[in-house]
């Protein structure tokens, strides 16, 4: 089974491609986490977990969900992580997670996809994003070949910098940067509730037709990037930046 968590669609796209290529079922962790569902999941022998990279590891909400949820029938697990640039030493923590789940760790693969973290970085324009997705195709095909053969992924880069970013920096990053207090709706907001619907942590609700954010945020960027009116800002950091979600690329390809 292919399990995935996504912020703005990159991981969903990769998970869908992997599930189709392996003829395996696809399991949406966003819906599961939003519903608070930790019932056992009948996965079968092989599990592929596809996630974005948050602070140089898999998202904390995903590792917490896995800690509470039995993967019935699972014996082996592969991790596929998409990122804007690097995953640090995420593989070391993925190995620990596999051991905790009593699963054979089959490795971690990194796939570069378009950046979406506009709370800190710039997202690409659509044409540039499309090019990044095209450049990811050879790595995705390599991942599919290894998965079909039941092979372990080769070890990713692991140096002192990687261990530092995934180690000491990760909890510090969550503590000081992963907060919702800078999100706000502008006058362009139409109160459609899209952000409420998309928030996997149920951290957004509408008051007087405008979104209000709570304190349980994972910085997935779904609310700000999927807003149909681009009416959400993250303080001053997101001003003037393009919004990115994968489905906009698919629509652009269909329009051509």
Predicted regions and their residues:
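A mid-sequence, solvent-exposed acidic-amphipathic segment
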Residues: 159-191, 197
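Iron-sulfur cluster-binding cysteine motifs and their immediate structural context
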Residues: 184-185, 190-212, 216-218, 222-239
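Short secondary-structure boundary/hinge segments and terminal tails
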Residues: 35-37, 116, 235, 244-245
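Long, positively charged, glycine-interspersed low-complexity recognition regions
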Residues: 230-256
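FMN-binding flavodoxin-like domain, especially the glycine-rich phosphate-binding loop
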Residues: 1-2, 6-14, 20-32, 39-51, ...
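Generic structural "secondary-structure junction" signal
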Residues: 56, 113, 208, 234, ...
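Conserved short-loop catalytic and cofactor-binding motifs
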Residues: 50, 82, 128, 186-187, ...
